[in-house]
Amino acid sequence: MSKTVRWAAAVAGTALVAVLVVGFGIAQASSQDAVASSQLRGACGSKIVVQTDWFPEPEHAALYQLAGTNGSLDAKKGWYTGQIGKTGVNLEIRAGGPFTGFQQPISQMYQDSSITLGYVNSDEAIQLSKKLPTVAIVAPLEFSPQILMWNPQKLNINRFQDIGNSGAKVLVFEGGVWIDYLVTRGWVNKSQIDTSYDGSPTRFVSSDGAIVQQGFATSEPYDYEFNIKQYGKPVKYLMIRSSGYVPYPEPLAATPAVLKAKRACFKLLVPLVQKAQVDYMSKPKPVNEKLVQIVTDLKSFWVESSAGNAWNTKEQRRLGIVQNGPNCTLGDFNQKRMQQVINLLKPIYAAKGLDTYDQNLKAAQMETNAFINPKIGLKTAKCK
């Protein structure tokens, strides 16, 4: 309860406090509930739709924490829906990957007007800032878990430069901007890149890990050793973050039109997302178990386990994937950091002849802390 007191005290209005508290089941119903519920429903409507970029996984846990573990699943569509506390507002979380034909959320957001928010990596937002502009409103993850991995018994790689020297195929999803960055640094050869990756372990397994493949540090190392029996041994990896490439991964973003229309909604919703991530990190098991159930019910190639998801959460914390910013706030944006990424990517896009990005883009155009509650963050030695 002390966490609740710490952040709720800074929120104006007892009705809004009731929304946040009841929304997470921290307190039972009070006389303020009806007012609080009508505030969120009045601002957001009866449903909030979020398009994710992959199968349900612990990196997406803030959303599932917010939707609760008693929701319903449309396994054919990959949509999970749960009510935000007792507010009468449903949160519909849509899986990505094969459920969207491997289209990225940013494309879906411009094709489907029912989508409120989507996961839009900051580098992708920069790349499409002219053609498909978006504004990020909260970042549950501080740094990306993105990795390149391989079988250390097959490839002698210890640093990024070794990837280029190895001559091995580098299997990645199409459209990943970070791979272009590694090419410009001279660490990966363009001829090595294969952008036909679809998330399946088949090619990595069939080559016995003699290729370099993208993944998450919080997922694939465990899965390939323990869940994917055809492989069943450790992988070695390098985190893309360690290359100096540090955009925000999977922040929740809106189109400018939705942002303008939903400001009142986002003012209430964003602190809920922040608090959901804090709550999940302190007690991850219920959501982790639910994620396993959802993925099992989806009946696709993606696999999760209770032990793997528990490991994932610990790795998120150990590797600093989830952490407060330079302050004691979780989910906010550092504009200086983001402007550095913009400046880094502009010459890459110019060299490729892209006309999809805004050449005059500033960090303030693509992210905002306007809805962030600065009092919500993880407890650390620095942040009590």
Cite the ranges covered by each PLM segment.
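N-terminal export and membrane-targeting signals
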Residues: 1-15
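C-terminal region of N-terminal signal peptides and the immediate post-cleavage residues
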Residues: 19-41
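Short, glycine-/small- and polar/acidic-enriched structural segments
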Residues: 35-197, 204, 211
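Short, solvent-exposed loop/beta-turn-alpha elements that line the ligand-binding surface or hinge
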Residues: 71-88, 167, 238-245, 260, ...
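Pocket-lining segment of extracytoplasmic ligand-binding domains
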Residues: 123, 197-203, 208-300
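Small-molecule pocket liners
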Residues: 142-148, 248-252, 257, 341
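Secondary-structure end/capping motifs
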Residues: 262-352
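Conserved C-terminal helix/tail region of periplasmic/extracytoplasmic solute-binding proteins
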Residues: 335-384
